[in-house]
UniProtKB/Swiss-Prot annotation:
Assembly mode: The methyltransferase is composed of M and S polypeptides.
Gene3D superfamilies found in the cross-reference section: DNA methylase specificity domains (3.90.220.20)
Keywords: DNA-binding, Restriction system
Comment text on domains: Contains two DNA recognition domains, each specifying recognition of one of the two defined components of the target sequence.
Role, per record: The specificity (S) subunit of a type I methyltransferase (MTase); this subunit dictates DNA sequence specificity. The single R subunit has multiple frameshifts and is probably not expressed.
Name of the protein: Putative type I specificity subunit S.MpnORF89P
Lineage summary: Bacteria, Bacillati, Mycoplasmatota, Mycoplasmoidales, Mycoplasmoidaceae
């Protein structure tokens, strides 16, 4: 978000992001502002509707109306005007908006304080754990420290198969169920980020995924069936290699961007990277040492986001409670 000297709007408005990954994000505005082409704008003309209440109500519902089947997620104006909302009397709207303002402010303060406090306390510990893991990993993977024979392999020689993900299928579900039970893994740096689920899978064996674009070289171990999304390389090794050893070995590789301005890692380039591999017994010994160190590092690394997510869930709970109360009041009046 930037700033300019002029403005196009002045007053109370509700805006939403129309496209890309934040499509359906709702904002309450009060003051002077301008808007980009990816911003939808709604002005409340009915004096019996509180704009801030409307913003909170849309925050709860808008994401359900985002079109995620296209290549670019989008929430069009035609869809926004179709979103059904129950409006209690104006006085109740104002009270609900005030309550949610308080919860939102408190949640933001708690998250900021929590993040700052935990970051200050844990950042040194996190850096130390990361250094410990990297030190032992690099030491154990260094062939100079091995007393037994080893062999140099290109990743293409180790692989039983290597494939790259494709476009997200048109038929998917945002919720996991008996039909849509295979997560679609995106190309990102997080170990688990299941946005949607598919009926089918492309990889069912234990595998290693490597981000091929964006956060190039983010390496994760997968022990479940899944459908990879575009720019995610999936590596399934042959049985004579220990996959946990390979997971740590691939994390030590500095994968480089190739090609276009944005840069990406192709399957052909991936296969050309190489590592030294000892006997299967030695591979398992090294993995047995590095696995707990890696868990020791990642458990701490995930603690802060988990706590902040808990705060968000608390806010969502109270927001849903209030809007469900509004709907129940409407149903009671009809009966």
């Amino acid at each position: 978000m930037g700033r300019i000297k002029t403005y196009d709007f002045d007053g109370e408005y509700v805006t939403w992001t129309t496209r890309w990954s934040y499509a359906g994000s709702i904002y309450y505005r009060n003051g002077k502002f301008s808007a980009s082409s990816n911003c939808g704008i709604l002005k409340v003309l009915n004096k019996e509707i509180n704009p801030k209440f409307l913003a909170y109500a849309l925050k709860k519902e808008a994401k359900k109306f985002v079109n995620t089947t296209s290549a670019i997620p989008i929430l069009r104006t035609q869809k926004v005007v179709e979103i059904p909302i129950d409006f209690p009397p104006l006085q109740i709207q104002e009270k609900i908006a005030t309550i949610l303002d308080t919860f939102t402010e408190l949640s933001a303060e708690l998250s900021a304080e929590l993040s700052a406090e935990l970051s200050a306390e844990l950042s040194a510990e996190l850096r130390e754990r990361k250094k410990q893991y990297a030190f032992y990993r690099d030491y154990l993977l260094n062939l100079k420290n091995w007393k037994e024979e080893n062999k140099y392999y290109k990743l293409g020689e180790i692989a039983q198969k290597v494939l790259v993900g494709g476009e997200k299928p048109a038929d998917f579900s945002k919720e996991k169920n008996e039909v849509y039970k295979y997560p679609i893994l995106s190309n990102n740096s997080k170990a688990e980020e299941f946005l949607v689920y598919s009926k089918t899978f492309r990889v069912e064996e234990k595998s290693i995924t490597v981000s091929a674009r964006g956060t190039i070289g983010a390496v994760f171990y997968r022990d479940f069936a899944y459908l990879p999304a575009v720019s995610l390389i999936c590596f399934v090794p042959k049985e004579e290699f220990d996959i946990r050893f390979l997971f740590h070995a691939l994390r030590a590789i500095k994968f480089k961007k190739q090609g276009s301005a944005t840069g990406q890692l192709t399957v052909a380039q991936f296969k050309e990277y190489g590592i030294h591999v000892p006997s299967l017994k030695k591979q398992k010994e090294i993995a047995a040492i590095l696995d707990p160190l890696y868990s020791f590092f990642t458990d701490l690394n995930e603690g802060i986001p988990a706590e902040i997510e808990l705060r968000k869930k608390q806010l969502d709970y109270y927001q849903n409670f209030l809007f469900n109360w509004v709907q129940n009041q409407k149903a009671a009046s009809i009966l």
